[in-house]
């Protein structure tokens, strides 16, 4: 179900956009299929967000597109609506492919596509690592209009010839900065080599560093650009604070002191390593605090079950690595704690964008040791923002 997109954020966005991009003020103005419009309204959208009103028409025209907008502004629906518009459901072949950096994000995209395409009889499969290969093969052999997946498993299914590529007309790279970072770069190229030469490429992300934009020239043709200025990228409406903890060992006591505040709604605590997540989870539980945890090396079934519990509000505090930072939408999260500041400053916006989704109040708290001060200053400079020391009444900011 779509919640209201933050229109205040829309109004403050400055789009550095290709000159020929027009704005479609309503979904009707986009000339979408009738059954797709029904799905959009049933999902809870009334009018398009800033990025949707600019990007959907361009993507539906078949243009290669680079779309950048902040977390919580409807980016997933932007490309989901576009894919649903261009596929032909009478042809039971894969026609659109979305690649995401995490399994959770790939699964979430599948559920958004299925919800928006509810009246279209669309088939969409999440093709992700850590799941049964036989099930993937069965689903793909049955025929899927859209596949949302992680690069490794998708490349594997293409090589096995279970994912047939000859009808693919659109490739979407979601959270493209993370995908194109070293880890996935080769796998992306691997997938791209198997696609028809005329495949349209859509690149979507909250952050697009210059080297990523530069790299897209290798597989995009005259792309239309829909961009927010980088210095506009700090997340409006989110309050950001730091707590000076001086030494690493003092962080744990500080977190325990904050626990009552954390459980006002729901909170996510980020650590930089899997080992740290496990250590902190054990330590919190030993001190009789209720927490759940998730990282990339857990079996997929366990990750799914933890995510479901957290989405339903059964668990209120989740400790995680950056696997959770990208695009996972849980409406009730109002507080993010960076137990460790992110190693990659571009992940900062993805982490704190988990709180205050769609214009709700959100607070981000950064634990800063004396060694972290330089990293914090670097983040402030990069996002042209100011992060103040946390006030005593932080609980009041969440209610």
UniProtKB/Swiss-Prot annotation:
Q: Which residues form the Helicase ATP-binding domain?
A: 56-226
Q: Which GO terms describe its biological process?
A: mRNA splicing, via spliceosome; rRNA processing
- Give the matching InterPro entries: DEAD/DEAH_box_helicase_dom, Helicase_ATP-bd, Helicase_C-like, P-loop_NTPase, RNA-helicase_DEAD-box_CS, RNA_helicase_DEAD_Q_motif
Q: Which residues bind ATP?
A: 69-76
The record's GO molecular-function terms, alphabetically, read: ATP binding; ATP hydrolysis activity; mRNA binding; RNA helicase activity
Q: What is its main location?
A: nucleus
Per the Swiss-Prot or TrEMBL record, what residue ranges does the short sequence motif DEAD box cover?
174-177
Q: What's the protein name?
A: ATP-dependent RNA helicase fal1
Record lineage:
Eukaryota, Fungi, Dikarya, Ascomycota, Pezizomycotina
């Amino acid at each position: 179900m779509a919640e209201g997109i933050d229109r205040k954020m829309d109004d403050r966005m400055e789009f550095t956009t290709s000159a020929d991009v027009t704005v479609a003020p309503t979904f009707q103005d986009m000339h979408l299929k009738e059954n797709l419009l029904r799905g959009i309204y049933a999902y809870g959208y009334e009018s398009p967000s800033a990025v949707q009103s600019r990007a959907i028409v361009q993507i539906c025209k078949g243009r290669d597109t680079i779309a950048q907008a902040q977390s919580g502004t409807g980016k997933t629906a932007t490309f989901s609506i576009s894919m649903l518009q261009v596929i032909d459901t009478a042809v039971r072949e894969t026609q659109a492919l979305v690649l995401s950096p995490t399994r959770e994000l790939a699964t979430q995209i599948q559920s958004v596509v299925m919800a928006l395409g509810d009246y279209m009889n669309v088939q969409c499969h999440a093709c992700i690592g850590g799941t049964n290969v036989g099930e993937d093969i069965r689903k793909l052999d049955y025929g899927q209009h859209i596949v949302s997946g992680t690069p490794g498993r998708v490349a594997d299914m293409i090589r096995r010839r279970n994912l047939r590529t000859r009808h693919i007309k659109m490739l979407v790279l979601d959270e493209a900065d993370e995908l194109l970072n070293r880890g996935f770069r080769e796998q992306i190229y691997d997938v791209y080599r198997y696609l028809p030469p005329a495949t349209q490429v859509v690149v979507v992300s909250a952050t697009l560093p210059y080297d990523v934009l530069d790299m897209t020239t290798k597989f995009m043709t005259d792309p239309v650009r829909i961009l927010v200025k980088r210095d506009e990228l700090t997340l409006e409406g989110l309050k950001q604070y730091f707590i000076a903890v001086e030494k690493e060992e003092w962080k744990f006591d500080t977190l325990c002191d904050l626990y009552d505040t954390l459980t006002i709604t729901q909170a996510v605590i980020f650590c930089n390593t899997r080992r740290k997540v496990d250590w902190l989870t054990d330590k919190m539980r030993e001190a009789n605090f209720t927490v759940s945890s998730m990282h990339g090396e857990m079996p997929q079934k366990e990750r799914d079950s933890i995510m479901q519990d957290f989405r339903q509000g059964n668990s209120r505090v989740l400790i995680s690595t950056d696997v959770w930072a990208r695009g996972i939408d849980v409406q009730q999260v109002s507080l993010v704690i960076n137990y460790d500041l992110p190693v990659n400053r571009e992940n900062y916006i993805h982490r704190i964008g988990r709180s205050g989704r769609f214009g709700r109040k959100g607070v981000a708290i950064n634990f800063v040791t004396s060694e972290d001060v330089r990293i914090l200053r670097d983040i402030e400079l990069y996002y042209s923002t100011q992060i103040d020391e946390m006030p005593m009444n932080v609980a009041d900011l969440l209610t």
